[in-house]
């Protein structure tokens, strides 16, 4: 179809005109003032400042409306700025205000608390210093009292408190005095120089541990005695109690107490007692002086027991045979050196 044949009545209109004709614009309406909602129709308007109420306490007009008590319009609550009190209209004046007390200046309260804290801090070091001085004074007085009663207390306090035994200075003087008295009682007839004094001086610088070590070392030698004092150690500066100058040891097969440790000589223990007695009667040069007087403890022996002892000794001599010469020199070296027969 040709365009010339189109109807001429059709007129093309712009799109804007079509839109405006189909969608008309709404006309603005005038705004109306909104009315506040009424609560039951009984709520009154808040009193204005022009209607200030006098304070019933100070009759001041410097008051302020706060709120309605119990949400009742008949009990408005006010606050007086002059006397800083609350009251309710239609009620009684309350001396104790509700809600945080009376309004006071918080700065003054904080400043007073700071002053009190500073005062307490300043007085606290003084009291601590006074207590410490008093404590030191009591300690000094107690220490002086103890040292006055016992002069050796100061020496013990300077030592190590962890030691399980007393320091050497506390036992040294008492032990040396005891040894010195024993030497004076046993050697009254001897006018020569007492070697015990020299040995006691050397014992001052030693301890009991050195004595045990020397006994264990000397127990390995052939001339040592069971639990006896060292024999060959003549050095005054060496360890142990050097009393070999005064108390001489017994024979090689007998102890310091006179007991025989040889099964084949001196007839056992009985022979040890007899040998010790003979050595004591013969002189100090052979067997030395015994530490205990066994002659005072000697019991009377009957004839029957004597014959039994002789038979036992003869039986031992027959049984030993040729081994007697080889084992005649055997002795007990002591518990400290291992506890064995040599």
From Swiss-Prot:
Residues 110-122 have a biased composition (Low complexity). Residues 127-136 have a biased composition (Basic residues). Residues 21-54, 94-136 are annotated as: Disordered. The keyword DNA-binding applies. InterPro entries: Dof, Znf_Dof. PROSITE patterns: ZF_DOF_1, ZF_DOF_2. Zn(2+) binds at residues 55, 58, 80, 83. GO terms for biological process: regulation of DNA-templated transcription. It is found in: Nucleus. A zinc finger (Dof-type) spans 53-107. Residues 25-36 have a biased composition (Pro residues). Keywords: DNA-binding, Metal-binding, Nucleus, Transcription, Transcription regulation, Zinc, Zinc-finger. Coiled coil: none annotated. GO terms for molecular function: DNA binding; DNA-binding transcription factor activity; zinc ion binding. Accumulates in the stele. Residues 41-51 have a biased composition (Basic and acidic residues). Its main location: nucleus. GO terms for cellular component: nucleus. The keyword Glycoprotein does not apply. Transcription factor that binds specifically to a 5'-AA[AG]G-3' consensus core sequence. This is Dof zinc finger protein DOF4.6. The lineage of its organism: Eukaryota, Viridiplantae, Streptophyta, Embryophyta, Tracheophyta.
């Amino acid at each position: 179809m040709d365009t010339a044949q189109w109807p001429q009545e059709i007129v093309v209109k712009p799109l804007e005109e079509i839109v405006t004709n189909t969608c008309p614009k709404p006309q603005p309406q005038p705004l109306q003032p909104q009315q506040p909602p009424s609560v039951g129709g009984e709520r009154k308007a808040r009193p204005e400042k022009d209607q200030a109420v006098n304070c019933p306490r100070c009759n001041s007009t410097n008051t302020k409306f706060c709120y309605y008590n119990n949400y009742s319009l008949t009990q408005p609550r006010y606050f007086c700025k002059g006397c800083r009190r609350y009251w309710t209209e239609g009620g009684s004046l309350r001396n104790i205000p509700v809600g945080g007390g009376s309004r006071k200046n918080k700065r003054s309260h904080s400043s007073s608390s700071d002053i009190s804290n500073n005062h307490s801090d300043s007085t606290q070091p003084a009291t601590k210093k006074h207590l410490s001085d008093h404590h030191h004074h009591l300690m000094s007085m107690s220490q002086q009292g103890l040292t006055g009663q016992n002069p050796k207390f100061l020496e013990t306090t300077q030592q190590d408190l962890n030691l399980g035994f007393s320091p050497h200075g506390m036992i040294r003087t008492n032990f040396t005095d005891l040894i010195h008295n024993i030497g004076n009682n046993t050697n009254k007839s001897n006018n020569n120089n007492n070697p015990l004094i020299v040995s006691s001086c050397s014992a001052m610088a030693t301890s009991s541990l050195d004595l045990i070590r020397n006994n264990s070392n000397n127990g390995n030698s052939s001339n040592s005695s069971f639990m006896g004092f060292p024999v060959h150690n003549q050095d005054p500066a060496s360890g142990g109690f050097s009393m070999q100058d005064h108390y001489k040891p017994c024979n090689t097969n007998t102890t310091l107490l006179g007991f025989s440790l040889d099964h084949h000589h001196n007839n056992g223990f009985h022979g040890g007692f007899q040998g010790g007695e003979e050595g004591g009667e013969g002189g100090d040069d052979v067997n030395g002086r015994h530490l205990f007087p066994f002659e005072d403890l000697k019991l009377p022996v009957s004839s029957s027991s004597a014959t039994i002892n002789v038979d036992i000794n003869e039986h031992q001599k027959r049984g030993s045979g040729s081994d007697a010469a080889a084992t005649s020199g055997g002795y007990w070296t002591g518990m400290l050196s291992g506890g064995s027969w040599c």
